[in-house]
Amino acid sequence: MKFLSLQHIAIEDPGTFKDFLLDDGHSLTTIQLDEGENIPSNLDEFDAMLCMGGPMDTHMEQEYPWLVSEKKAIGEYVLNLEKPFLGFCLGCQLLGEVLGGQVVKSNPSEIGVLDIHSQEDIKIDPVFNFLPHTYKALQWHSYEVAGLENNKNVSVLGSSPTTKYQIFGYKKFAYGIQFHLEIRSTTVDDWAVVPEYKNALEQSLGSEALPEMKNAVNAEISTMQEQCKMLYQNFLKILSD
């Protein structure tokens, strides 16, 4: 299978999801948008599109003009080609906009290892049906998707007290995930050096929050990585259908 990954900062790649697909012999084409790389014109040659997180926000089209072409590419891939898509964090928000929603400020920001609650529709979802009723996930976001209620093809699969659309699916082939299942053991340290992420962490949890977050992630990382493996395996199945 041929995967396309749209990335917004080099250290935020598909993580363990990437490790699983490469170990299985699939190909991965990475487009580093923040470094000026262009999205391929023939998107239909790819079996799936991944869209990762980043320190920018969806409304920052003036500062990051490539966001405009990225949104168009996601729309082409999901709405016109109807091919499998998986968006994490910023990628989730970009999908939400493409599907007619808005991206709004979270109140409060969600940063840390926090609970996600599965919703009823997850039981019949082919990709996320493995998740338990409540589980822990790494969150690091100040914006979230809203306003998808009028899209009859969107299902809410996971929520938190702050964020309704923690996981949502579109027609059971395109998915947004606001949190991070794809993390490696080095992820928190890697992200903590990004100024925007560091500032958000300290504003939410205090200047000494990093060691506590690392401990919380370490306590859950084996479960998170096993869940990411199941996500990868289920996502691969819909590519084969």
Task: Give a label for each model feature.
Residues 1-4:
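Extreme N-terminal starter segment of soluble prokaryotic enzymes
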Residues 6-8, 33, 90:
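Cofactor-binding loop segments of dinucleotide-utilizing enzymes, especially the Rossmann-like FAD-
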Residues 12-16:
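Short N-terminal binding/cap micro-motifs at the start of the first secondary-structure element
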Residues 19-85:
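Flexible gly/pro-rich beta->alpha loop and the following alpha-helix that scaffold active-site loops
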Residues 78-102:
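Catalytic nucleophile loop
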Residues 99-186:
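Pocket-forming structural segment of enzyme catalytic cores
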Residues 183-241:
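Acyltransferase
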